[in-house]
Amino acid sequence: MHELLLFASVPSHQHHELLQQLTGLTAMQPRHCLERRLIFKATRKPDLANMRSGTGQGPDIVRLNKMLNGQMFYTQVVGPLSEADFDGKPSSSDSQDVSMSGTHEAAGSSYDYDSQPWRLEFRDTPEAGFRSTITARLAASAALPKGDVVPSMNAWGYSFVTEYVVEGDMFIYNDIVIFLHRVLQYPATGQEPHEPRRQLPSFRDLAPLEKTGSYILQAAITVQDGSNQELMRTASQHLFGLREQLKSAVRLEHADRLSLDTRAR
């Protein structure tokens, strides 16, 4: 499938006003989203056909494996979170007994790493020359087993690189998914952990990646058959229509292609 996108940077002071505007435009209340995003890098040509038990060989896996076609990319493994997963205050002994985990654990948190659901998301490098005013790229996703995904990812030819948290609000407007979000980083430690954290810090310990506190507005449409030019043209027109409706608030535009390059070198 193909994903068509437009993006805008939203200053922190404009965040609340834009939320209200999107609520009115879409006639829905925002759906708050929290996600863990684990980044993996291909260290050899992957073969997702050799998946371990628990994933199955469903159509999503078959399609994803065909799309990767033995090429090497960065991919992300995404897991939904709730605010309760971050509840609790760091204990006084955190600095001593959790230094190996790369972060302070949240005492009293309900988070259970072994029950964490995951999905593997692949996003290709945006197509060159599709349209100078829109971002288009191949996309695919597949469900993964709950819990520790590292052994499976390693077996498929991927190694863990880093992780972060995404916080935002989602709206649906006709066939457009609108996501107003920001990237949050874990507390700085002496060194980066070599595997995903099994416990999460207190939410207040997370820091925005963008120091100014700005947000990203992403508008996306998924087209199942990217070879159908009429569908692609219609989807593009819908995004341009949204851009026109929001032009007094934000400037939706395509992203720099190389800034979204997912190829592993």
Swiss-Prot record:
It comes from the Eukaryota. One of its GO terms (biological process) is positive regulation of transcription initiation by RNA polymerase II. Residues 91-101 have a biased composition (Low complexity). Keywords: Activator, Nucleus, Transcription, Transcription regulation. Signal peptide: none annotated. InterPro entries: Mediator_Med18. Gene3D superfamilies: Hypothetical Protein Pfu-838710-001 (2.40.320.10). The keyword Transcription applies. One of its GO terms (molecular function) is transcription coregulator activity. It is found in: Nucleus. Residues 85-112 are annotated as: Disordered. GO terms for cellular component: core mediator complex; mediator complex. The keyword Transcription applies. Belongs to the Mediator complex subunit 18 family. Component of the Mediator complex, a coactivator involved in the regulated transcription of nearly all RNA polymerase II-dependent genes. Mediator functions as a bridge to convey information from gene-specific regulatory proteins to the basal RNA polymerase II transcription machinery. Mediator is recruited to promoters by direct interactions with regulatory proteins and serves as a scaffold for the assembly of a functional preinitiation complex with RNA polymerase II and the general transcription factors. Component of the Mediator complex. This is Mediator of RNA polymerase II transcription subunit 18.
